[in-house]
């Protein structure tokens, strides 16, 4: 299979500081991949290497089977790659039309082609006469996308393009951009530090930590079966408890719970998501005491201190509950675990 992008054993350092170490992954044509990780983990550096703005110290990068870095070098303008930066990088004193047209060959910079590109990103062609400061942040990012699309790239790179937008505008702009790229069937890589954004935007998610890729998989795999505890805790709220695993069951502060088969036995740590913990209407299951209630609008997070037995140290867990609740700190509740926990070596 020829992949749209292949990265193999890539290292990169700046001033003696190692930023990327042995990064390797492949991206299928027409797919969307999100690279998610905390600030400073190396994800933007990786994107710049793919774009051709920097050279790797070791390893190779290939686009559609053609090596463009390591064993050969193709500068950015020789790669069929579109790039949208975090701030859009529009020319502030040029019109929207001129900004979009910058991505086109001179002979193709016609009003009709610019109008077509604006319509692709759900902007009225009349916006061509405006300047960037007359647009909202979301509209500016869509203009930046239109400019990148003008080159008809085989690969689109998005470097945290929604991070500067407020929550409502960010979600709407993200949906529009995802729809545009899907209709154009352009292979896309999104870099973000926003976990829900990565999970909702992409077909596959790559979790980056300290210059390495910790795990690559579908959004469901990354969220439901993270490879280790740090990945579990980074990608979403996680309840992690000490446990003893025997076959397909684990004994922990949440009681006797089912675990996904992954070869872990004996002393271990188990992870469940807050939404897997259910309050029992009759108080059955493990008992606990509500210690705090966090209101988040459509959902609530309940902090519950478990009333453990068998000499186990009391544990505090978080329970996600949708809708309103009458529970207050001090109330006693019963809880049980739905589905399977994931076990990790102690």
From Swiss-Prot:
Membrane topology: Peripheral membrane protein
PROSITE patterns per UniProt: ABC_TRANSPORTER_1, ABC_TRANSPORTER_2, FBPC
Cross-referenced Pfam families: ABC_tran, TOBE_2
Coiled-coil features, chain-numbered ranges: none
Catalytic activity, as annotated: Fe(3+)(out) + ATP + H2O = Fe(3+)(in) + ADP + phosphate + H(+)
Main localization (coarse): membrane
Family annotation (Gene3D superfamilies): P-loop containing nucleotide triphosphate hydrolases
Origin superkingdom: Bacteria
Limits of the ABC transporter domain: 5-235
Signal peptide from the UniProt entry: none
EC numbers for this chain: 7.2.2.7
Disulfide bond sites: none
SMART domains linked: AAA
Keywords: ATP-binding, Cell membrane, Ion transport, Iron, Iron transport, Membrane, Nucleotide-binding, Translocase, Transport
Subunit structure: The complex is composed of two ATP-binding proteins (FbpC), two transmembrane proteins (FbpB) and a solute-binding protein (FbpA).
Function comment: Part of the ABC transporter complex FbpABC involved in Fe(3+) ions import. Responsible for energy coupling to the transport system.
Name the record gives this protein: Fe(3+) ions import ATP-binding protein FbpC 1
Organism whose genome encodes this protein: Rhodococcus jostii (strain RHA1)
């Amino acid at each position: 299979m020829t992949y749209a992008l292949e990265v193999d054993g890539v290292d990169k350092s700046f001033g003696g500081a190692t930023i990327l170490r042995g990064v390797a992954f492949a991206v299928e044509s027409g797919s969307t991949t999100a690279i998610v990780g905390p600030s400073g983990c190396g994800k933007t550096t990786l994107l710049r290497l793919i774009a051709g703005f920097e050279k790797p110290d070791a390893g190779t990068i290939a686009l559609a089977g053609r090596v463009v870095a390591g064993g050969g070098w193709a500068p950015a303008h020789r790669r069929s790659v579109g790039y949208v930066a975090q701030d859009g990088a529009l020319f502030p004193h040029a019109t929207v039309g001129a900004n979009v047209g910058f991505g086109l060959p001179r002979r193709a910079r016609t009003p009709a082609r610019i109008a077509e590109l604006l319509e692709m990103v759900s902007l009225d062609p009349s916006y061509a006469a405006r300047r960037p400061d007359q647009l909202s942040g979301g509209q500016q990012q869509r203009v930046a996308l239109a400019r990148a699309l003008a080159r008809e790239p085989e690969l689109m790179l998005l470097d945290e393009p929604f991070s500067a937008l407020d929550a409502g505008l960010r979600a709407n702009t993200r949906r529009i951009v995802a729809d545009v790229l899907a209709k154009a069937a352009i292979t896309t890589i999104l870099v973000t530090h926003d976990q829900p954004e990565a999970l909702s935007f992409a077909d596959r998610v790559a979790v980056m930590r300290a210059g390495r890729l910790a795990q690559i998989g579908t959004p469901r795999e990354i969220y439901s079966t993270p490879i280790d505890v740090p990945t579990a805790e980074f990608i979403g709220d996680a309840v992690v408890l000490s446990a003893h695993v025997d076959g397909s069951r684990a004994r922990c502060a949440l009681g006797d719970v089912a675990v996904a088969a992954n070869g872990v036995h004996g002393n271990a740590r188990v992870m469940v998501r807050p939404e897997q913990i259910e309050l029992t209407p009759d108080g059955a299951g493990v008992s606990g005491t509500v210690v705090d209630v966090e209101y988040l609008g459509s959902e609530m997070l309940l902090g519950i201190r478990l009333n453990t037995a068998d000499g186990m140290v009391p544990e505090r867990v978080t329970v996600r509950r949708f809708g309103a609740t009458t529970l207050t700190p001090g109330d006693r509740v019963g809880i049980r675990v739905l589905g399977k926990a994931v076990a990790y070596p102690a």
